[in-house]
Every structure is written in structure tokens, then in C-alpha cells.
Amino acid sequence: VTLSPYVSARTKTLDYRYRQAFRRGAIAFEGAHTRDDLIPGEDRGYLFGEGRFELRDGFRLDFEIKTTSDDAYLVDYGLPDYDRLRSEVALERIKRDTAFRTSFIYFKTLRESEQQDEIPSRIFDLNYEKRFFPGGLGGEMRLGFVAHSHTRTSDADITGRDVARATVDAEWLRSWILASGLRADVQLGASMDTFDIRDDSAYPDQITRSTPRAALTLRYPMTRHEQSGATQFLEPIAQIGWTHVSD
């Protein structure tokens, strides 16, 4: 813990910093508490913090906090001049064949041109992907799920729009290397999206769409070695793809 008091005729400020390491993680906070004549009779200050923890079963928890007592404090005291404050907590696990991450983010605007209740201040994300290798079909299969939402505190039409989305995706990938050295990559997939929209009369409350896709890519990698020891690489690529969005 580090405490640094500062006293003058116009302000009384206590700066503080706290850091601690644990067996599975670490945290760090810094901030200040102020009483000054810019806003008489009011407590002012800021708090920034971050941390990371390695949890059981390969999970990792990260967090970041940024908050101030008022929009002008950082500028008044020569601190980093953020136009938006971002706080986040996230949980993730990355393994060889699976990837998972979920997070919640909160934004606080410091811009004079923005109203706090009209920005998407609360944001939730969830991502999950799994891959496996089917024996009979060959290649690689990927299955994914994505969820997202952002909300505004305003209930006004259009400017207070809130959106939630969920996506399910499946994809098959396979490659062949022919005797000539030509490589062929095939990609087949499809996704399904559903949207929930509130406080916006320009859109329906529910939208669902599907998006199949296919692609064939041909590559012909070539190398040439120079007498100087340099190696040149050339890889012509041709691709044809197709997709269709249906509501």
C-alpha cells in the first residue's frame, strides 16, 4: 500500500496505490480522494484497478475497473484523458479443441457530446467454439455459439435501442494435396442468427436469418533457392465462393 497526501490552499488530495500477488493471481488498484474548491463540499476522486486469476480446470478470470466521481476529475488533475471509461470482467478457457470466453463490459462516457443513457453502456458477450475430426468424413468440423447483447438505459424510441443476438454456426474444412503439388481447400458451413430488438420502431422485434456458405480454394506453393542463400516463395491462389442470406 502506498499513500501520498497532498494539501494546498485549494485542494486536499490523498493518492493511493495497492498491489498484491496471490498464489493464483494478482490485483492492482490506484486512485485518489479529493476535496477542493472546484466543486465545494463534494467528495471527488477516481479509481482504476485490474486483476487476473488462474482458476481451476484451466479457467482464467480477468477484470478491469475505471470509474470517477465526475466527468471533469481526470482533466482537472492532469490524469489520463479518457473520453470513455471501460470496466470489464471476463472468464475464459482456451484448450486444444475448445475455446470459451464470456465477458460483461460497462462504459461510462466523459464526452460532452454524448448522453450516458443513449450509449450502449452495458455489453454482454459469450463465445464458444469446439472442433473435432470425424473419422469417416475426414477433415475438421467446427461448431460455434455466439451470444451478444447491448443495452441503453434510455427507453426513447430509436435512440434507446437495445439489441440481443444469438448465433449458431457449423463448418467443415478439408484439404487435399495432389501429386502435382496443388493444394485444394474446401469449406462448407452454415449459420443461424436470431435478433431481439427493443425500443426501435424502425425494426421488427424479432429477426431470424440463415446463411449457408461454400468455398473452394486452390493453391500452388513454389519455392526457389538462390546461390546467395536467399529463398523466394510464390503461391498463386484461386478461390470461388458462394453464400446466401435468407430472412
Task: Please report, for each region that a protein language model flagged, where it lies by residue.
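Outer-membrane beta-barrel proteins and related beta-barrel translocases across Gram-negative bacteria
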Residues: V1-D247
